[in-house]
């Protein structure tokens, strides 16, 4: 999709308006300002994607600035991890900067604020200041120290800097308005005394600037044009502007561009918590093995689980930039990694719950090395050799002694195709003393052209290598584990979030290296974990081939009854039904419906879509659904024709914004 045809989000509209009103494109500059007090998580990727994405779109510099103003919680370990994660995602920053770079400049400006009676030293306790703050409906009370003389304030503030006072004895506050309806404007703190070793400045400072004072002024020093942050900071904008406007008077000759703060909805994900404090609790209480545990929503955890940078960037693009808070279904993130790995991951065979198959008419001691395609989505990946012998393993779940006509896997008297090999028929079984099947004795046929309905994966017993398999599931069983005020989030920990077993793998995997990703055919996507050692591979399950979580969730009986006829309808009919209300759905619901339409599109013939090209103008939702399905056909090689071009052009000229945006996504 070209930049010319892609619809602008509301932040891009703001930037375009600023450019139209005289802002030079050369003055565009953005930043990502993490606090180095923890590891980046999936929630941060939206802020990263927004700022760095704008940098890429406008060819503008993006600073990586560490907001390191609280030495009690910040460490170099987190700085290094943040840099590693952003680089892994594929983004490049213009300059690596730190708020601590500006400590002297901020201090000098604070002195000027005191001299202009815009700041004062308060000597009350934090409790007293809190009581004087007032409420959202009632104004606050002025501090008894609010009218200290400039001389006294300067002397006290310098004494704070020189370490003459205890922590909490004095603070510096901005002098604004204790009756302002916005409580953040009621004489906010600018500095506090803190005796803590800073990871960069050491013990040079014992006063540290507060977030609201540091944030905007750092933007101003760096000449950031657009300071982008999440919606929770929208009430802070008034204070951001107050500090900015006052400092601008001191420095406008050297720093001519005042920054602009704008807010967007942060990323909230179902079955996930985003609080660094609560994630730290999971680590400290050994619910997980560390910040990079594959069940953690940290970028390092996702990377270790097997997520790719491209899948996360695609996820952020699909989520989009919105003004309203919402919760994104984690299944969208899983969809993105499936889609990415489907294109890039080589197919291999692995058996996780084995049962032995003996092919009685295959010569003992004989072995063959059969050709197997690496990835049908990418012919450039070529093929590999897979060993076949008289004894193989298949999955226990792929065999039943007795089964109905709808069971297309192996059963007594039934035939299945072995992937890349022969067709076998189950003749009889061997059982142990408890009556459990231990072996299935089969015969094979070299007539591989025969039509059979089931195809199974397998590995040769003689050639299989073993590996530890870690199957991960969601860490929480509740969609919103952090939303229950009366319950501890630990009550919602999924006791089955990790299952470890030994698996049997085809021998080509013996050379797999840490980080390599594969599709274990019919099982899911897996990657080689960091814990792997030569001869002792460990694989993490990244995601299944389809969303199995939905099957595990208990559903009301009524919903189950309603779903049966829906599943039996033709795919094109379901797409039409999904499209009916599409344009009236909220963004999150639209995305879920879109994914469903994309999945159904493979079962729809082009002529079925073409029949809907004449859909009435007022049925915009149906036309959107047709466009979504068409795009899936384009991916599979459908060529454009006059009818398609006319349909797309008509959609681009429509009055419905959703329809126009969907049409504009097609080159």
Where are these regions (language model features)?
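Non-catalytic all-alpha helical scaffold/repeat segments
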Residues: 568-667
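Core subunits and conserved enzymes of cellular information-processing
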Residues: 237, 243, 317-319, 327-572
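N-terminal catalytic cores of NTP/NDP-binding nucleotidyl/phosphoryl-transfer enzymes
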Residues: 6-15, 20-83, 199-230
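Active-site cores that bind ATP or allylic diphosphates and position pyrophosphate for catalysis
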Residues: 68-70, 76, 98, 112-279, ...
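Long, charged, mostly alpha-helical binding arms that flank functional sites
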Residues: 254-336
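Conserved short loop/turn motifs at secondary-structure junctions
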Residues: 33-36, 65-73, 95-104, 127, ...
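A glycine-rich helix N-cap at a beta->alpha junction
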Residues: 78-102, 110, 117-119
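Residue-level signal for inorganic ion chemistry
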Residues: 22, 51, 82, 113, ...
């Amino acid at each position: 999709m070209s930049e010319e045809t892609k619809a602008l989000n509301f932040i891009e509209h703001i930037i375009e308006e600023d450019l139209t009103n005289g802002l030079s494109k050369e003055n565009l500059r953005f930043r990502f300002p993490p606090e180095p007090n923890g590891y980046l998580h999936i929630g941060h990727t939206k802020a990263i994607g927004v700022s760095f994405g704008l940098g890429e779109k406008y060819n503008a510099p993006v600073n990586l600035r560490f907001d390191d103003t609280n030495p009690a919680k910040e460490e170099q370990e987190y700085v290094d991890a943040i840099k590693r994660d952003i680089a892994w995602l594929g983004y490049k920053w213009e300059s690596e900067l730190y708020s601590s770079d500006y400590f002297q400049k901020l201090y000098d400006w604070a002195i000027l604020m005191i001299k202009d009676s815009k700041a004062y030293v308060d000597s009350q306790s934090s409790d007293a200041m809190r009581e004087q703050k007032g409420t959202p409906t009632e104004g606050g009370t002025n501090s008894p120290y609010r009218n200290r003389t400039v001389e006294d304030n300067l002397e006290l503030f310098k004494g704070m800097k020189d370490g003459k006072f205890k922590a909490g004895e004095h603070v510096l506050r901005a002098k604004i308005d204790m009756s302002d309806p916005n409580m953040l404007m009621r004489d906010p703190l600018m500095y506090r005394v803190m005796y803590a070793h800073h990871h960069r400045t050491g013990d040079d400072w014992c006063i540290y600037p507060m977030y609201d004072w540091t944030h905007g002024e750092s933007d101003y020093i760096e000449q950031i044009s657009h300071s982008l942050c999440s919606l929770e900071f929208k009430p802070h904008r008034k204070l951001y502007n107050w500090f900015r406007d006052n400092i601008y008077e001191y420095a406008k000759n050297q720093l001519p561009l005042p920054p602009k703060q704008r807010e967007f909805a942060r990323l909230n994900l179902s079955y996930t918590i985003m609080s660094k404090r609560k994630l730290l609790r999971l680590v400290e209480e050994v619910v997980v093995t560390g910040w990079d545990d594959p069940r953690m929503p940290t970028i390092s955890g996702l990377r270790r689980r097997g997520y790719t940078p491209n899948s996360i960037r695609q996820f952020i693009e699909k989520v989009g930039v919105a003004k309203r808070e919402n919760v994104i279904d984690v299944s969208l993130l899983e969809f993105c990694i499936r889609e990415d790995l489907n294109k890039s991951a080589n197919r291999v065979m692995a058996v996780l719950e084995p049962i032995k198959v003996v092919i009685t008419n295959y010569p003992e001691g004989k072995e063959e090395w059969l050709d197997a395609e690496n990835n049908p989505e990418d012919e450039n990946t070529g093929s590999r050799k897979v060993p076949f012998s008289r004894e193989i393993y298949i999955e226990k779940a792929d065999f039943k002694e007795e089964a109905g006509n709808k069971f297309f896997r192996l059963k007594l008297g039934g035939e299945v195709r072995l992937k890349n090999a022969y067709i076998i028929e189950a003749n009889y079984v061997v059982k142990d003393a408890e009556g459990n099947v231990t072996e299935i004795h089969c015969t094979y046929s070299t007539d591989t052209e025969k039509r059979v309905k089931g195809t199974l994966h397998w590995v040769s017993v003689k050639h299989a290598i073993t590996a530890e398999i870690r199957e991960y599931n969601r860490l929480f069983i509740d969609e919103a584990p952090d939303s229950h005020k009366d319950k501890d989030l630990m009550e919602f920990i999924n006791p089955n979030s990790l299952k470890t077993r030994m698996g049997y793998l085809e021998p080509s995997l013996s050379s797999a290296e840490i980080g390599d990703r594969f599709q274990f055919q019919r099982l899911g996507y897996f990657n080689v974990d960091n814990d792997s050692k030569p001869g002792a591979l460990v694989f993490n399950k990244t995601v299944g081939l389809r969303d199995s979580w939905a099957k595990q969730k208990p559903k009301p009986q009524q919903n189950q009854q309603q779903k049966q006829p829906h599943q039996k309808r033709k795919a094109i009919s379901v797409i039409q039904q999904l499209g009916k209300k599409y344009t009236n759905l909220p963004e999150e619901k639209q995305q879920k419906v879109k994914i469903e339409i994309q999945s159904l599109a493979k079962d729809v013939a082009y002529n079925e879509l073409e029949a809907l090209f004449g859909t009435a103008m007022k049925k915009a939702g149906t036309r959107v659904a047709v466009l979504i399905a068409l795009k899936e056909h384009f991916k599979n090689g459908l060529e454009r024709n006059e009818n398609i071009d006319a349909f797309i052009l008509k959609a681009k000229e429509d009055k419905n914004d959703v329809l126009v945006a969907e049409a504009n996504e097609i080159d």
